[in-house]
Amino acid sequence: CAIYFPDWIYEGNQIWHPFESSNHQSIDIRSVWSLNQNYSIRDYGSKQNFNSVIKENKINTSIPHGYHIDAAKLAFYIRKKIKDKVTIIDSEVVVVNKTKNSVDSLILANGITIKSDLYIDCTGFKSLLNPNRKTNSLKDRLFVNTAVAGIVQYKNVNEEQNPYTTAHAVDIGWIWKIPTKSRIGTGLVFNKSITSVDDAKDFFCSYWGRDRITPDKLRVIDWTPYYNDTPWDGNVVSIGLSAGFIEPLESTGLALSMFQAMKLKEKIKDNTWDTIKSELYNLEYKEHFESCVDFVSLHYSKTSRTSEFWKFVSDTYKYSDRLNTIISLSSERFPTNSCSPKGQFPSSAWIFWLSQMEYPLANDNINMSKYDAEKFIIKHKSLLDSLSARQITHTEYLRKFNKT
């Protein structure tokens, strides 16, 4: 239900990014908090290890949440589900035949030729169907470009099997932890211009303990942050890594892929398309992508950590014009759904980060005194504590779920 960011800004600090805002008596708790900002909004980041989205042993879909999923198992599951509706050809593309600015056909390694009106390029950074695409580099706005990733087994499942993702800031970057039923997916994100891959592997294995993971078990992932200026180009639509990538923080890669898929579905729902639709698609994607870049960049905007990596971040950090405007307007008008930047992340996400990074936020215009606001917040927190006391732990739920 949240992402936990320990040691961001400075060691010992904690930042929480819940997936929803808290409401009590039909009043948004963020609005009340804006009247009494001395009361820490961090108290609403639930580090207690219970699962708040469970209702009668099922997922309560009325509460925003995320899944910790084994990607390989998910791919197998989807493939099994669609096999009667979609023709699956398991082969590699060896030749892309083009006519002017469009793809005419694909020749596969198994000898099959594929002809289509519209092609979706999900071939990753290589972008086999549109390798000469015009790209927009983000190297001057982002700070990491490499990760080493692996799997660790639980040592203390009750402490480590959390109902949230962790992004732990460390001296050379940050470490993600994604606990699933049987193990923890984890990786170290860093800048290879500052830290070598071998040094990063050594740091990462020391972090977890070499009895849990060793350098030979780690996969190296490289990228250059960028986005495709025209992801819909002719009759090719680039989706996923072929359209752009920021970095692993906040899972924007998956979110952007889903956004593209839904936008494409919207544009071709009548089984027709033209240059106007493709240009609108490209414009909407660029605006959405830029909003994600600004939100991720915000995470790095204030740091007092002094290691070489974090000093590089603070020395080279630049606010985009858009991010500067968001910060400035938030100090004049409290961000709400009707008065906040459009994009992947709602007003609540911006509030949680801006407030916990101690950017100035305006008071919301609600009819309540500062004294009443404090009483309201204390009462709300008491309610949360009462609810948490009645919930089963995340680990208990997973054990129960395995038996049903």
Q: What are the residue ranges of the model-derived segments?
A:
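Dinucleotide-binding Rossmann-like beta1-alpha1 core, especially the glycine-rich loop
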Residues: C1-S52
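Extended charged low-complexity segments that act as oligomerization/scaffolding linkers
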Residues: Y4-G12, E159, Y207, K267
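Extended, composition-driven regions rather than compact fold-specific motifs
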Residues: E20, D43, Q48-I54, K58, ...
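Predominantly flavin-linked oxidoreductase catalytic cores and closely associated redox partners
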Residues: I63-S206, A261
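General small-molecule cofactor/ligand-binding pocket signal
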Residues: T87-I89, D216-R219, V237
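Conserved FAD/dinucleotide-binding core of flavoprotein oxidoreductases
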Residues: V170-W223, G244-A255, K267-D270, D274
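Conserved mid-domain beta->alpha element of the FAD-binding
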Residues: Y226-C292
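Long, low-complexity C-terminal extensions of enzymes
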Residues: E266-T404
